[in-house]
Amino acid sequence: MSFVAYIFFNRGIASEIDGMVYIPEGEFKMGSKGKLEHGDDGGDGRIGLEVGVDEIPLHIVMVKGFYIDRYEVTNAQYKKFFDATGREPPVDSVAPDAPYNWRNGNYPAGEDNHPVVNVTWYDAEAYCKWADKRLPTEAEWEKSCRGGDGRRWSFGNSFITSFVNTHELELKWSQAVGSFPEDRSSYGVYDMSGNVMEWTASWYNPYPTSTLKRETFGEQNRVIRGGAWLTSYLTARCTSRNFAVPEKKHRTMGFRCAKDAN
């Protein structure tokens, strides 16, 4: 495995390995403090930013140092896994004839560097294991997005439509990974606020000290993070939570992998 960039002092930890970015060990503030967070949200007249009740409360989480993919896993990368393992191709079970599905073992022409979508949680987990990696936990994903300064979106605290591939931009499909250089966290991780949503390793559960009760909590749904080309600026926030059964496939859902630092 090649080591790129520099070594973190005497700890023997590279800032980047094979397309993965190092996220340092430490505490960070996870979640949201209340149902309405006030402040600058883009200068469009809104005086507050609505948050999901499952994001509450704001709490401190300790995360060990780890690596995370700089970009979402692409069609071209997934194709190597598909060819090597004979995995079921990424096809939307609800719309099997849609033009965005893989055909005859191939992804749509010209979409080599688009994020792979229509993969189940099990597909994503299997790919990461095949690549000697793993899926990131929900906490790891949020820390990677918020950076060291607790941003609302990967790029800052004000939403700017042109910075990210969400519904507001009306591109109506994913774009090649890294196409939006501003959609980049302070750690250097791209497309966390837009393009496609991403599976995580975590079960969908309430946060510590939360009294929220939902039938969807528990070991039945996996957490999905990030915004997508079909979702709004609210879903694009680093703290926004979504979920699905592990068997779910959707044209807005992809993933990226993580790896332990040691």
PLM regions with names:
Residues M1-V91, W121-Y122, D149, S158, ...:
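Short, compositionally biased
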